[in-house]
Structure formats: C-alpha cells, structure tokens
Regions:
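Soluble extramembrane regions of membrane proteins in the secretory/endomembrane system
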Residues: 1-113
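Cytosolic-side membrane-insertion boundary helix
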Residues: 90-146
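Alpha-helical transmembrane segments of integral membrane proteins
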Residues: 123-350
C-alpha cells in the first residue's frame, strides 16, 4: 500500500479538529492495469489491515470479461460490499478516532507532552547502550550523553511538540533494539557452544531463543507505538519516516558490533571499532571481492527496494499467487522476508 500526498489534506484535517476518517483509493493509473478480480481482493483486506473507514471506489472505464461497463461496475461495487461485510464491517457513516471523554463528545487523542519525556530518555538509553558496546564508554560518559540527549529531546518535545523529534526517536527505537536483541542472542550462542546431535533439542533450543529475540525486539516496537501514538499518526497524516533505513541500519549496526566483538579484520589487534574500520578500508580488493560485492549489491537492491511507502522493485507473479494462498490459509499473512529467510537463517545459526 502506497501513500500519496494530497493538496489541502492537512489544513482540512486541522480545520475539522481531526474528525476525519482514513480513506483508501486505488490509483487511477494503477487501476487501468488491473482486472476486476485482482482489484476486488484489495478492498476488504486493506480495510482490515490498514484500519480504513472509507472506500473511495473509482469505476472501470473499459469493458472486461465480456461485460459492458455498467454491468461490470455494478458487480464490482456489490462484491466489494459483500467482502467488507463478510469481515465484520457494517456499511454506513464512517467512524472516527476519538478519545474517551466524560461528556461523550468527540475529541482527538493527543497525549500530554510530558509523557513523552521518559520515553525519550528510555530510547536514547538504548542507543547509548549500543554505542557503549562499540566504544566501551565509561559510566560517566554514558550518563553525560544520556543527560545531554535527553534534555535536547525534552525541550523540543515540550516546547515545540517535536514531530520530527518523535519520528527520529521512533527510528532509533526501531533500529537499535532489534540489534541489542541479537547481541544478547549471539552472546548466548557463544556461552553455550557445544555439539548437540539431537535434532529435536536443537529445534527446541532455537525456538525459545527466537522467542527471546522477538520479546526483546518488541521493547523497541512498544516504544515506537508509544512515541507515535496520537490522532495525527493514527490517521497517517504524519507517518513513520525511515522505513528503508529501518531495513538497512540494523544490518550495518550488527555488522559493526560483530567486527568489534570478534576482532574481524583486526589483524591480531585488540582495539575499538575505529581500528577494525581502518583495517577494513585498507583491505586489498581482488576480483572475488568485486564479484561478492556485486551479488551483495543485487541482494541489497531487492531487500531495500521492496520496502517503504513508495513503489520499488516489482513483485513477481509467483509471489503474488503465494501471498494470495497465505492470505486465505492464515489469519494474518506473514512477511516473506521473515518466515522464508530470517527465521530459517536463525534456526541454522542456532
């Protein structure tokens, strides 16, 4: 699902005191490429997954399936209504986000700015924990960094509302806490290195380790939800910025930590991350390095291009069919990168 800016959208929402509902529309240019059954499946699924309350349906302007335009569009709208109601929704006036009030009247939800201050300190503490793993900061430096960063964040949040600050804090939480989670897991693997011939024991061990990694990562997810929790973000007038960075940064951050922790490319030297990076950039490049980087660049292109709020790498037809199968077979379709690549790789590493 992509996001398109609309002229006048923000002033209109503010003028309405955020008494507005989320709307979904299939882009006109995209709809020209779709057959009716393919467009049909999007509506109810999007309503459920994206909390949509208004479906803005544009008619097909070219006959399909041997039917004229009127018959095609009447059937199209009728089936959309049936699919939406089959998922438990009711047709009628759209509901809007509102906080509970004593008089029962509508009011947009905006938390007290002071509540964001402890969140900012907690998120920054996670970032400083990671930096300490790389640079071995003393307790004094850690406290100084936390105090300085916390004061700056608090001032922007309390005085200006700090939308950009909140988005930056959310980015830190979304990238750093999964990395901290994996550092715990890798240290756990290092502490219990032994040959376990029993396949069942390996699977059980890897399963609870994966569960631990998920739980630790959910700490960061909880911070993201808390720091971006208000009507503007619920309605996606403001959105989480940095989706592609959220894919790239954890890989880079865990790689830097791994180089530091296991003295990769250190040539026998025990030093901080600066030593490892200096040795890395002094490495002599060979043809096999270029070939490896080419493969890595292609993988990165697919990995990053398939993320974000905007169009990127096209999805193959086979994968679209697999998605449809998973949507029908499971309550919620899992992310392919997770259950086809990430989770199997975790079990192999464990």
């Amino acid at each position: 699902l992509q996001f398109a800016a609309m002229d006048g959208l923000l002033p209109l929402a503010e003028h309405m005191d955020y008494r507005v509902a989320r709307t979904y529309i299939i882009d006109k240019a995209e709809q020209r490429k779709l057959k009716m059954p393919e467009a049909l499946r999007r509506w109810a699924l999007t309503d459920e997954e994206r909390n949509i309350r208004i479906n803005y349906i544009k008619p097909f302007m070219i006959p399909q399936e041997g039917r004229d335009i009127l018959e095609l569009n009447l059937d199209y709208v009728s089936k959309i209504a049936d699919d939406v109601q089959a998922r438990g929704y009711k047709l009628g006036p759209a509901g809007v986000f509102s906080k509970n009030t004593t008089d029962g009247k509508f009011a947009p939800y905006f938390p007290e700015r002071a509540w964001l201050v402890p969140l900012a300190f907690a998120i920054l503490a996670g970032g400083i924990m990671y930096l300490t793993l790389l640079f071995n900061f003393s307790k004094k430096i850690q406290y100084m960094l936390l105090l300085t960063g916390g004061i700056v964040a608090s001032v922007t949040l309390l005085k200006f509302g700090g939308i950009l600050t909140r988005q930056l804090l959310a980015l830190i939480a979304a990238t750093v806490f999964p990395v901290l989670s994996m550092t715990v897991i890798v240290e756990l693997w290092e502490s219990c290195k032994k040959n376990t011939p029993n396949t069942l024991k390996i699977i059980i061990s890897a399963t609870w380790q994966l569960a631990l990694a998920v739980i630790l990562s959910l700490i960061g997810a909880s911070f993201v939800a808390a720091v971006l929790g208000d009507s503007r973000f619920f309605l996606e007038i403001d959105i989480y910025k940095g989706v592609k960075l959220t894919f790239i940064l954890p890989v880079l951050l865990i790689s830097l930590w791994y180089m530091q922790r296991f003295n990769v490319l250190s040539k026998g030297q025990i030093g901080n991350i600066a030593v490892h990076l200096k040795n890395f950039f002094s490495t002599r490049i060979t043809v096999k390095h270029v070939a490896f980087l080419g493969v890595l660049a292609f993988v990165a292109y697919i990995f990053v291009g398939r993320s974000g709020h905007t169009a990127g790498v096209p999805v193959p037809a086979l994968e679209i069919k697999m998605r449809l199968f998973l949507e029908q077979m499971m309550y919620a379709r899992p992310r392919e990168k997770e259950f086809m690549i990430g989770h199997p790789a975790f079990y192999l590493a464990a």
